[in-house]
Amino acid sequence: LAVGDYAYLVDAAGDIREAVAVLAFDAAKATIDLARGVLDTTPQSHASGTRLIGVGEWLAAEGAERAPGESVFVGAIPRTSTDQGDALLASNGQPLVLTGRQALPYPPGRIRLNGQAEPAVVAGDLTLAWAHRDRTQQTAYLVQQDAGDIGPEAGVSYTVRIRDRNDALVHTETGITGSSFIWDVASAADAGALGDHVTLEIVAERDGLESWQPQVRAVDRAGYGLRWGQHGGGV
């Protein structure tokens, strides 16, 4: 790996969780700096044992045309000038299900809740804002999460889903073409006391296709009747 390369964070099952960009190495401290959630991925939580796998410059292609939903086995066969080894199968030897990722719209970036990147608690109206992304334009370099607007891709809209602390869906807003959404106090009242902690999910959509990964943020809500024991009903 070198600075400027990208890599994947892969879980114990061999599934890709997140793409990251390599920003810097520190040999003395044995550390590596990464930019989270590049390309069509978003920042995820990762369990112990997650592996960082670099993406090299060696590529292979087959002539067969395949469709999303098909399953294939993928592997590499190590060879020398005189011999070859056993195939090294991807995904721990499990079949890979094709998803057609290359056609899916990129999720938005630069997520903000009431103007903040990662607030622990908000009060009053909840304003969710984001920056546009465009898979057709993001080809020259790895765009980081906090970058401003790129695009949007033609035909893209956004869907916001809000879940309460029991993970029940309490609101869905579709067809958003701008870069923000406000869940006002009156609308939020429908969630009742369970709305004191909400998870927000935002995806990009185009022609019936949804971004491969959503942007997800969780936050406490303070206000009248909400989180009195923690925030005194306010922030």
Kindly label every feature range from the protein language model.
Residues 1-31, 145-146, 203:
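Ser/Thr/Gly-rich low-complexity blocks that favor extended beta-strand/coil architectures
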Residues 58-64, 140-195:
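Recognizes extended acidic, P/S/T-rich segments that occur
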Residues 26-33, 122-124, 175-181:
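Ser/Thr- and Asn-enriched, surface-exposed coil loops between beta-strands
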Residues 87-141, 208-234:
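Pro/Thr/Ser/Gly-rich low-complexity, intrinsically disordered linker/stalk tracts
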Residues 66-86, 182-214:
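Beta-strand-rich modules
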Residues 15-20, 163-174, 211-213:
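Surface-exposed loop/edge segments in extracytoplasmic proteins
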Residues 14-93, 99:
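Small/polar beta-strand repeat architecture
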Residues 4-6, 19, 125, 155-159, ...:
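Exposed beta-strand and adjacent loop surfaces of beta-rich binding modules
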